[in-house]
Amino acid sequence: FNYQNQFGDSRLYGNDLEDNSSRIIYGLENNFKLIDKRFDLNINQSYDFKKNTNYTRQINQTSNFSDIALEAKTTINQLSFNIDARLDNNELEKKEMNYSLDYNNRIQLNLNYNETNSRAFKDMSSDTQSLGVILGKKINNNIKISMSSNLNLKDNYRPLKQSLNVSLFDECSKLDISYIDERFNDNYNMKPSETISVSFHMDYLGFFGFDETSNLF
């Protein structure tokens, strides 16, 4: 559920279910300057003509009026900041909050914070909080190193997924060597995994790659 998704022909992801509801979407889009910086603010809400549809059941919507979707963004010097929020239709309490911060100058830094209330979706049993971090550095014209981590803030910052990637490249080819360490919630009965992958791309010849996987746990 978000501002952009409200305008989609189908608000459901995947092809399992059809978005079988006619609706009206109304809102406000505005941009303004504050301290010589541009801010964009978008708000919308939908009115579904039918209750209890495939989509409204998925997002726990019990009335014809949807929750309120809010989107805001600005760029200050080299920093880009975005907010994507879902507010309860009746009490204006937050159900979903997404904050992202991007910096791309001498280094690449991306921070994504998400919190979702258990009432936001039909299949959720508990609140969630997570923080995604991506950090990259171009060493020279032919080498780049990057790492990423997805942390479960509800479980003592336990990492759900971590990766380290080294890229070697020139004008017509690229070699990626990656290490990926994944941890899963036991509710899904999935085992942790560690993967080392090597992939090679070359212009005009397409793609060649292989993965070496070891499950150590």
Task: Please describe what each predicted stretch is.
Residues 1-217:
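Outer-membrane beta-barrel translocator/pore domains, especially the C-terminal barrels
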